[in-house]
């Protein structure tokens, strides 16, 4: 499976494969990864993430959050920062009240780390539900929603202490029949306790144009960082053909999809058009070896100034914004054949109205 990869994978313990389970449930192998400090029932870090997610969200064990999140946990999103387990519980209760019949599908959990240093996981999931109760955007609508999310977490001794969360709220708002710009203006009018300051980086470094990074592209992290820099910072979309399959399938924020390399390039341009002076920064890289190929997970940040005409629509121009994103890239025959590119355009759009 790994012979044709453009990078080398280091040896590490085998873990649960999500796409080999019965009826969408992950297989439960014999314990195969050291998990000191975690409950003995968890066989590996993927098993831990999937099971606590199912128990909290599907089985309604909301109070189990006290056992799996640190009391002073920090959760980052496009809307601000949460710094308390009580806020996590309050948000979970409100979401379950708004979407009481939610169904979860676990698409991938990339990971890194170990029991001593702690584990980093990037959990890509798909949620289907009916909006019955009030959401932050208004009363229940009775409409169905189908959205993806990614939660990147750092866990140690059975508790998550840091998380970065991206939920496709752009798709959710549209599926609920609401105007995304009106919703964004409402969010912008609310008071935030903690906001992120954005100072866009200049595109030029003095009189010197941006150059390729000197990286070891035989490593997973080096390969991913070089890819994102070449495409998003150097804007060399023509180089995609050496890394992406001609029939690549992409799923992006806002419920967007692209099939084929040409359409994938158009998708990237649509994102860049919204932040045309944007600078891409890769913040973390992890990976998983699934039944249908290796998946590389990248947490990234795109910072710059807003412009109308891209994924943000007719937004106020020239506003400093940041787009927090997570991408999961599945490889086969040495190239990317499928990508999940998650970002929350609603959260970015709200920044343009502040």
Q: Model-predicted segments: where are they?
A:
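C-terminal and inter-domain tail/linker signature
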Residues: 2-354
């Amino acid at each position: 499976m790994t012979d044709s990869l453009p990078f080398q994978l280091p040896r590490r313990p085998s873990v649960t494969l999500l796409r080999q389970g019965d009826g969408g449930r992950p297989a439960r192998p014999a314990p195969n990864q050291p998990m000191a400090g975690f409950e003995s029932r968890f066989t590996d870090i993927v098993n831990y993430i999937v099971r606590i997610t199912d128990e909290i969200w599907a089985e309604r064990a909301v109070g189990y959050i006290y056992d799996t999140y640190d009391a002073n946990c920090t959760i980052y999103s496009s809307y601000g920062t949460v710094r308390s387990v009580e806020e996590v519980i309050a948000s979970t209760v409100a979401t379950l009240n708004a979407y009481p019949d939610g169904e979860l599908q676990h698409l991938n959990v990339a990971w890194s780390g170990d029991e001593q240093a702690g584990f980093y996981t990037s959990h890509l999931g798909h949620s289907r539900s009916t909006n019955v109760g009030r959401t932050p955007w208004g009363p229940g609508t009775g409409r169905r929603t189908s959205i993806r999310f990614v939660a990147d977490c750092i866990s140690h001794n059975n508790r998550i202490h840091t998380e970065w969360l991206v939920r496709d709220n752009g798709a959710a708002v549209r599926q609920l029949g609401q105007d995304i710009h009106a919703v964004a203006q409402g969010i912008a009018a609310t008071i935030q306790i903690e906001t992120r300051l954005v100072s866009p980086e200049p595109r030029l470094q003095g009189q010197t144009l941006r150059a390729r990074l000197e990286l070891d592209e035989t490593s997973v992290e080096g390969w991913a960082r070089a890819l994102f820099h070449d495409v998003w910072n150097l804007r060399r979309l023509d180089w995609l053909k050496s890394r992406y399959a001609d029939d690549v399938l992409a799923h992006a924020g806002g419920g967007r999809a692209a099939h084929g390399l040409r359409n994938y390039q158009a998708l990237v341009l649509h994102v860049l058009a919204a932040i045309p002076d944007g600078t891409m920064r890769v913040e973390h890289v992890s990976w998983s070896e699934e039944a249908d190929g290796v998946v590389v997970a990248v947490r990234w940040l795109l910072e710059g100034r807003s412009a109308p005409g891209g994924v943000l629509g007719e937004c106020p121009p020239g506003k400093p914004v940041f787009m927090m994103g997570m991408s999961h890239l599945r490889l086969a025959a040495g190239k990317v054949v499928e990508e999940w590119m998650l970002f929350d355009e609603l959260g970015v759009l709200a920044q343009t109205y502040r």
